[in-house]
Amino acid sequence: RLAIIGSGFLAWVVYQYLNAHYFFEVDVLGKSNKELWGDKLKDSLDKTYDIVIDLNTRDEVFTQDLVTEQGLIVLGAEKSNGITTRFEKLLWNAVTVVFPSPRQKNFKRCMEMAVKMIETGALDIDKFWSKGYDRETEWQDAFKESDYRMPGFNRGYIEWL
């Protein structure tokens, strides 16, 4: 079993990749993009998981019992408020923690793979972005409409090219 902490764009990309290439039972902890995630989205996690991919700034991965013995944590987000932990459960359970980074040898290859997956339709991002805005003439509308979202509006983006 696998848990993704965070329900934004990066979580959606990770989920789409895993769903296309692996057979995991996936739960997603988050509050955003409810229409997109459907029943995968959870308000809390009450199980343990073989793999936890943490893409959020909160500290659940360190404060809750989420990872099985010899499990894996992929820590993909800085903890903006800091964390307080003694790591005793992670140490006792021989949990592996990895930190993805642009300095990691496979990072560029992963980004190239994501581009190909989007181009071929293997990674479906159509439901994630609702509207594009011209950066010269509509940038203020992008922020306004994002703050006061109409039904069906998920996310907007500003076109830079």
Give residue spans per PLM region.
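Mid-domain Rossmann-like dinucleotide-binding core that forms the NAD(H)/NADP(H) cofactor-binding site
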Residues: R1-D43
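C-terminal hydrophobic helical "lid"/dimerization subdomain
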Residues: A3, S7, V13, K108-L161
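Short loop/turn motifs at secondary-structure junctions
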Residues: Y22-E25, T48, E69, D124, ...
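Short, well-ordered alpha-helix to beta-strand connector turns
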Residues: G38-D39, Y49, Q70, A94
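A short acidic, Gly/Pro-enriched loop at the edge of an enzyme's catalytic core
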Residues: S44-V52
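Glycine-rich phosphate-binding loop and adjacent beta-alpha segment
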Residues: N56-A122, W160-L161
